[in-house]
Every structure is written in structure tokens, then in C-alpha cells.
Curated annotation (Swiss-Prot):
<dbReference type="InterPro" id="IPR023026">
    <property type="entry name" value="Trp_synth_beta/beta-like"/>
</dbReference>
<comment type="pathway">
    <text>Amino-acid biosynthesis; L-tryptophan biosynthesis; L-tryptophan from chorismate: step 5/5.</text>
</comment>
<keyword id="KW-0057">Aromatic amino acid biosynthesis</keyword>
<comment type="subunit">
    <text>Tetramer of two alpha and two beta chains.</text>
</comment>
<keyword id="KW-0663">Pyridoxal phosphate</keyword>
<dbReference type="InterPro" id="IPR036052">
    <property type="entry name" value="TrpB-like_PALP_sf"/>
</dbReference>
<comment type="function">
    <text>The beta subunit is responsible for the synthesis of L-tryptophan from indole and L-serine.</text>
</comment>
<feature type="modified residue" description="N6-(pyridoxal phosphate)lysine">
    <location>
        <position position="94"/>
    </location>
</feature>
<dbReference type="Pfam" id="PF00291">
    <property type="entry name" value="PALP"/>
</dbReference>
<keyword id="KW-0456">Lyase</keyword>
<keyword id="KW-0822">Tryptophan biosynthesis</keyword>
<dbReference type="InterPro" id="IPR001926">
    <property type="entry name" value="TrpB-like_PALP"/>
</dbReference>
<protein>
    <recommendedName>
        <fullName>Tryptophan synthase beta chain 2</fullName>
        <ecNumber>4.2.1.20</ecNumber>
    </recommendedName>
</protein>
<comment type="similarity">
    <text>Belongs to the TrpB family.</text>
</comment>
<dbReference type="GO" id="GO:0004834">
    <property type="term" value="F:tryptophan synthase activity"/>
</dbReference>
<dbReference type="InterPro" id="IPR006654">
    <property type="entry name" value="Trp_synth_beta"/>
</dbReference>
<dbReference type="GO" id="GO:0005737">
    <property type="term" value="C:cytoplasm"/>
</dbReference>
Length: 407
């Protein structure tokens, strides 16, 4: 480790080392300060914490269990465990921060939640939270992802959300963020932009991390109860990086726990626009209101990106991940599309668990660690279930795995 981890991050300006901050138009500066003040007040409010704890237990179904994947473990020679965030209400980790953001918005007197979504999991979770607390909800989603993740689009609409297509650029997650931010600028007084990851201007990277830290806090206790010790390795996929920060946060000071973040290598790391491996190939820059590693084109603008996982195709990453990369605390690797799909089917057929394609990147990396000689324990954050992906996977990859499309 190059430097010791500073647990008191971010600082008051929202910086993790040199990354983070708040780069917003002047008309939003006071709004961001107000959100931060309201959040800090809620952190000290026993009623807020009690309400969130009650909903986590009785609405989400927490704590999510840890499962020993015995069949995969036997096959590959390492003890592979899964933190089952796929079993949460709405099917992923996103509900953890969406409930927090929704309750915060209600306490601030907001009328509407507004957000982007890639795979649709954040959108479904936010629409769910909005329905629960009685707020309107607008979700911006790339036109390509709307077609690809149709089941989640239907869920959002059933829950009462407006799903608004982003039709510019590559029509995926980055464009959805652009469209949501543009809409938010028009009326920041009555809306809360409920950012869907540990990205964006301060206080969102801190706030979303804090809400997601329940994953790691639970996992630390559960793993010790199951095995008598901490895991040798943690593995989680990284797009913006919320599920990963949720797991990693409880183990950052444990130097004997190796931590691995897994980025999407897409079709090729060698071609611009064919991957979204920000920490692997990016450089520091500013986009969407924060400084972090990002993938830039020749003009310094965000690169086009690709991943088979809609929730991972983002040209930047949470600022705390950038900091953890620079100090050497977390190793960031990558998994390509084909490896992720292989892991999608392998976990399904070896353990009876259909994972989200995003989470499949983490499963694939855990398998690769085992194949490379890791014989200790590997705890994978299974961040979501694959219901949303099954039609896309069968249509595009089914023949390779002996499945004919029924459509």
C-alpha cells in the first residue's frame, strides 16, 4: 500500500485526495450546500436512522445473506462466497441508497425525484421508493437501454414513474445522465436529483457510499460468523461504483484483505469506444460535476464507451475509487463481454442463481482469481439478479449455450 487509508474522507469540500468536489453551475451551488446540510442533519437524527433501519429490515428484507458457492468452489479450488444483494426487494443493491434519498427528499419538502438509469435497476428502486414515500418520479434512460432492459421499463411505469428516453449520442447511460441533469437545472427547488451511484457533485459520492455501506457492515459480521475470520479477497463490479464502495468500505483498513474492483473491458481494451475501463485506461478530468478518472477523446470530452452490461457503460467512476486506485489500496482489473456472459451461465448452471450481467463481471473475476492460483476465500458482491437480462442474453448469446429463442 502506497499510503494509509484516510477514513475521514471526503473532506468538507467533498474531496477524496484530489478527486471529487462540486463543479456545478452557480445557480446550483447553494442547492448542493442545502442538500449537504440536510443530509448531515439527517445523519444526526435518530428518527431518520430508525426509519431507514425499519425499511431495510421490513421492506427491503435485510440483512441479505452470504452464500457459500460450494459447486464453484470445488470446481476452481478457492472458497467463493456471494453477498446476495440480488435478493433485496427490487432485485439489486440500488434500493439501499434510493430509500435514503427518497426520505431525505421528503424531509426537504421536495415534490419529485429525478434520476438517470442504465440497466434500469436504479430507476426501478427509485420509482419504488418514490411510490412508498409519496413523491413524483422522472427517470431518464438511454433509448438503447430502454429497448435492451424492457422488463425494468415496464416495472418503472407500473410503479408510477415517467420514463423519458435520452435520444442523443449513443443513447445509453452517459446520455441519460446528461438529460437528467439538464432537466434538473430547470427546477432544482422542487426536485431532488437522486444520483444513482457514488458519482456527481458533493455530497452525492459520500451520501450514496454511506447508504450502501450497510452491505460491507453486514458482510463483515456475517463472514466472521460463518468462517471465524475475514475474507482473503473482496470482488465487486465497478461502473460508477456504488455496490463496490458499499462492500469495500467496511474492509479498507484491513490490510490482509485484498480488494478487487472489476471494470468492463467490453469488446476490446485496445479500441476507443469498445470498453468502459475508466480506471484501467483513463486519466483525471471533470464531468457531471466532479473530478475523477475519466475516458477522454482527443478534445478532452467524454469518450464513447461500451459494455454488454448497461449499468457499467459510463466514462467516469466514483472519486473515492480514483483515490483508492492512486494509493494502491484497491486493485482494479477488467472482464470482457464474453467472459461476463460465460460467468452469467456458469453461476446459473452451477449454483442455480441467475446474476445480473453487471454482477457477472465480478463472478468472472473471482473465477479468474481462482484459476490464477488463489486458494483462499473470495467474497463476491452479487449486486443484482438477472431477470432484466434474460431476453437480451438468450437473443444474443443463447445459441452458444444451447438455448433457442422462444420469441
Amino acid at each position: 500500500m502506497k499510503n494509509s487509508f484516510d477514513h475521514n474522507m471526503p473532506n468538507n469540500e467533498g474531496y477524496f485526495g484530489e478527486y471529487g468536489g462540486s463543479f456545478v453551475p452557480p445557480e446550483l451551488e447553494q442547492i448542493m450546500r442545502d442538500i449537504n446540510a440536510a443530509y448531515e442533519e439527517c445523519c444526526q437524527d435518530p428518527e431518520f436512522k430508525d426509519e431507514l433501519a425499519r425499511l431495510y429490515k421490513h421492506f427491503v428484507g435485510r440483512p441479505s445473506p452470504i452464500f457459500h458457492a460450494a459447486n464453484l468452489s470445488k470446481k476452481y479450488g478457492a472458497d467463493i462466497y456471494l453477498k446476495r444483494e440480488d435478493l433485496n426487494h427490487t432485485g439489486a443493491h440500488k434500493i439501499n441508497h434510493c430509500l435514503g434519498e427518497a426520505i431525505l427528499a421528503k424531509k426537504m419538502g421536495k415534490k419529485k425525484l429525478i434520476a438517470e438509469t442504465g440497466a434500469g435497476q436504479h430507476g426501478v428502486a427509485l420509482a419504488t421508493a418514490a411510490a412508498l414515500v409519496g413523491l413524483e418520479c422522472d427517470i431518464y434512460m438511454g433509448e438503447v437501454d430502454i429497448a435492451k432492459e424492457h422488463p425494468n421499463v415496464v416495472r418503472m411505469r407500473i410503479l408510477g414513474a415517467n420514463v423519458i428516453p435520452a435520444t442523443h449520442g449513443r443513447k445509453t447511460l452517459k446520455e441519460a445522465v446528461d438529460a437528467a441533469f439538464e432537466a434538473y437545472l430547470k427546477d432544482p427547488e422542487t426536485q431532488l436529483y437522486a444520483i444513482g451511484s457514488v458519482v456527481g457533485p458533493h455530497p452525492f459520492p459520500k451520501m450514496v457510499r454511506d447508504f450502501q455501506s450497510i452491505i460491507g457492515n453486514e458482510a463483515r459480521v456475517q463472514f466472521k460468523e460463518m468462517t471465524g475470520k475475514l475474507p482473503n479477497n473482496l470482488v465487486a463490479c465497478v461502473g460508477g461504483g456504488s455496490n463496490a464502495m458499499g462492500l469495500f468500505s467496511a474492509f479498507l483498513e484491513d490490510e490482509n484483505v485484498a480488494i478487487h474492483g472489476v471494470e468492463p473491458a467490453g469488446r476490446s481494451l485496445d479500441k476507443v469506444g469498445e470498453h468502459a475501463a475508466t480506471l484501467t485506461l483513463g486519466e483525471p478530468g471533470i464531468m457531471h460535476g466532479f473530478k475523477s478518472y475519466m475516458l477522454k477523446d482527443e478534445q478532452g470530452e467524454p469518450q464513447e464507451v461500451h459494455s454488454v452490461a448497461s449499468g457499467l457503460d459510463y466514462p467516469s467512476v466514483g472519486p473515492q475509487h480514483s483515490y483508492l486506485k492512486d494509493i494502491g489500496r484497491v486493485n482494479y482489473g477488467s472482464i470482457n463481454d464474453d467472459e461476463a456472459i460465460d460467468a452469467f451461465f456458469e453461476l446459473s448452471r452451477e449454483e442455480g442463481i441467475i446474476p445480473a450481467i453487471e454482477s457477472s463481471h465480478a463472478v468472472a473475476y473471482a473465477i479468474k482469481l481462482a484459476q490464477q492460483g488463489e486458494s483462499g476465500s473470495i467474497l463476491v458482491n452479487l449486486s443484482g439478479r438477472g431477470d432484466k437480462d434474460i431476453d437480451f442474453v438468450v437473443e444474443n448469446y443463447g445459441a452458444k449455450y444451447g438455448i433457442e429463442s422462444l420469441i
